[in-house]
Amino acid sequence: MSFRKPKNRKEICYPFIYESALTCDYEVHTDELCSLLGMVLAQMPEGFDDVVADLETLHPKIYHLNGSVRGKNGIFEEDLEWLHERYDHYNKLSAGRVTRFVLPRGPVAVMALHQCRTGSKKTVRLLHRLDESGVKFEETLPRFANLLANFFFVLTVYIKMKLDVEEIDYISINY
């Protein structure tokens, strides 16, 4: 089969979907990440107004991250500073709760946050591949994506702590 771009615009889900460059893969992936974050917001239990407010602030920044490779940069030092502050806030509140590698388990919102966490790691990998292929972008992007993965993890720990959900250690047989 010869895979061709349709002439009918209704049959094209994204203007760049037929590109062979990784840029489109990055954009489709970060679009998925933004959707996953929307799912987290839809599933957040009562009593987490602080987390909801932070996730609502963060939500459009995922689309800023999305458009920052093809378009102009939308992730700035101020965004990194804000995310560092929020990471430190939740990390301090849940200090000492996780000291080992834990299995990703918990209520739906926590599991959706774990999906965001792993999606952020994929974002870092795609940025790395884009960089290797010669695509230029601001160094704030991989820093933000790495921090994002860690932030999502800290939120899972904080939420499970407040809900009194046990963390289950993962005991590796590999290392």
Segments predicted by a language model, with ranges:
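Phosphate/pyrophosphate-binding loop motifs in nucleotide- or prenyl diphosphate-using proteins
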Residues: 1-175
